[in-house]
């Protein structure tokens, strides 16, 4: 049990809301369909969680082999700030690369079994979606594609945790997917992309040293990076507004609009970072849960985590609000 807890923690379970909440939102959207069933939905959700943990460990494993950890140390030694948490458990001797590989394979194997169970119940589309997710997840940092090193990693994450995950979850829960899930999953995918994109902007120096061509680095100029921050933060709300305007989505989907200040803060704070402007890193109630922020501050991680946590919480609240909307609509209609 202690070993399992160790690997769950080091697989960055703090990031699980970016997969669990979109999955639950998809289940809430599936609940109105006549063939809805809880048990394949729960099996699929379990598989999604295991896959997410496995992919995070895969990212650590391939980055470690790519010498990304040493690159981050070099950047820090040169006086630049960078996010230094990757593979600390290997650096400290708590685990070996071989043990990391075994843990990664174990999580992904369990996810594969869960996918197989849902495939048996729902049919071949589940197998296609599961295999596509596995291929993209491994290819994020792994050979031969190494998408995260060629400027496509952030976009791949958005596809995986947006349309691919949500369409798959709705199909697992009810055996079909509808037009609404396409609209909503596109919006969610952009917000998930925003989490890893913001991370990449904050880690530009370390990624450059490691030779990791993230999408943020591919854009090159501060203006382009800031423009895409605006796109990833604001387009999700625009998608829902258009969906309501053309009659594809119920007007209640606009209940997410009060979350806009979180998006505006992220754009503002990334602009400050790109322009080397000092801003206060003080949590506010509307930013959502911030964990032990004083601890982050003592470890000089407040500058990174306040932005990352706001981006994560934005996805969480966006999905929670829409899930509640769907439950209420199902009860009313």
What do these predicted ranges mean?
Residues 21-26, 155-170, 217-221, 285-295, ...:
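Small-residue-rich segments of transmembrane alpha-helices in multi-pass membrane proteins
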Residues 245, 249-333:
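Extended hydrophobic alpha-helices typical of membrane-associated regions
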Residues 1-43, 47, 55, 145, ...:
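Topogenic membrane-insertion module of multi-pass membrane proteins
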Residues 72-120, 216-247, 295, 299-319:
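Multi-pass membrane catalytic core of lipid/isoprenoid biosynthesis enzymes
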Residues 27-46, 112-128, 165-186, 240-253, ...:
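Helix-coil boundary and interhelical linker segments in multi-pass alpha-helical membrane proteins
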Residues 24, 33-58, 70, 126-138, ...:
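Membrane-embedded alpha-helical segments that form the functional core of polytopic membrane enzymes
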Residues 48-80, 194-216, 221, 225:
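Acidic (Asp/Glu-rich) catalytic motifs at the cytosolic membrane interface
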Residues 87-176:
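Intramembrane alpha-helical segments
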